[in-house]
Regions:
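Acidic-glycine-rich active-site phosphate/pyrophosphate-binding loop
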Residues: 1, 132-152, 195, 199
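Phosphate-binding loop of NTP-binding sites
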Residues: 1-98, 102-113, 176
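A structural micro-motif
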Residues: 8, 92, 114-115, 128, ...
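Fold-independent oxyanion-binding glycine-rich loops
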Residues: 13-15, 41-42, 65-66, 91, ...
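Residue-level detector of flexible, active-site-proximal loop/helix-junction positions
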Residues: 17, 45, 102, 123, ...
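Nucleotide phosphate-binding/pyrophosphate-handling subdomain across enzymes
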Residues: 51, 149-242
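Beta-strand->loop->alpha-helix junctions that form or flank phosphate-binding loops
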Residues: 112-137, 154-160, 184-189, 198
Length: 242
């Protein structure tokens, strides 16, 4: 939303309104002035995605990381991934992490007719090749190649989850023909999502990292890695509060 809203009238999901109730409330905001809708779709069991597909009718599909949330209602991560891909059956384009073996295999099995923009940090033959990711103390420098053009931008994040999200957003911006210089400028000004690895300066040389918005083990692992990086650079003692 931050990357595209300067040029387009956008309607988006409020926070994570991604359920069978949240999605219709999000779509309800659409009006004749809207040029683009950004909606999150989440599932907790088999069969739910078809209902969300009928509501959203997406043309651009972005498949984010497949985590362990609600896994108790699925036999495997592959089953969950295949269920999520039903949302994209009528899309014009599907964007995903081409280095994720689970996602790549499921996309191949799903026989989608959509154009694929699979980004990769390993395979130079992928449509969007990420040639370098360099983490600094408080920002990350990312270089990429798309349609034989090389570019570089910075983001004010260093955690892996934010980097993966940014690469998905990069692919969407490129598909929508956002100029590279605008992408570079807006990436540098991205603001963090509230309560997701939110860093606040506390008292007595204390730094607070608020990740209360996430609740699964994969997110906790990312948050702990982020905590270690921040504390080591500043020489601080670490305390985890669950």
């Amino acid at each position: 939303h931050q990357l595209l809203s300067p040029d387009r009238r956008i309607v988006r999901s409020p926070r994570s309104y991604n359920s069978q109730i949240g999605v219709p409330l999000s779509v309800w905001q659409l009006n004749e002035e809207a040029e683009l809708g950004i909606f999150e779709a989440g599932i907790s069991e088999m069969g739910e995605m078809n209902a969300l597909k009928r509501m959203i009718k997406p043309t651009i599909g972005i498949l984010t990381n497949i985590g362990g949330a609600h896994q108790e209602n699925f036999f495997s991560l592959q089953e969950k991934c295949m269920e999520k891909l039903t949302l994209f059956k009528d899309c014009d384009v599907v964007i995903y992490n081409g280095d994720n073996e689970l996602i790549s295999n499921c996309v191949a099995k799903s026989m989608l007719t959509a154009r694929e923009i699979a980004w990769s940090r390993k395979d130079i033959e992928r449509p969007l090749y990420i040639s370098r990711v360099t983490k600094k103390e408080d920002h990350t420098v990312i270089s990429y190649r798309y349609l034989d053009m090389d570019n570089t931008f910075c983001i004010p994040f260093i955690d892996d989850a934010s980097i993966e999200n940014v690469l998905n957003c990069l692919a969407a911006c490129l598909y929508l023909m956002t100029p590279a210089d605008q992408i570079t400028e807006r990436m540098a000004r991205l603001e963090p999502i509230a309560m997701r690895l939110e860093v606040k300066e506390g008292k007595n040389n204390c730094v607070l990292i608020n990740d209360s918005y996430n609740s699964d083990l994969a997110s906790l692992d990312i948050a702990l890695d982020f905590l270690v990086r921040r504390s080591e650079k500043k020489g601080l003692k670490r305390t985890l509060i669950l």
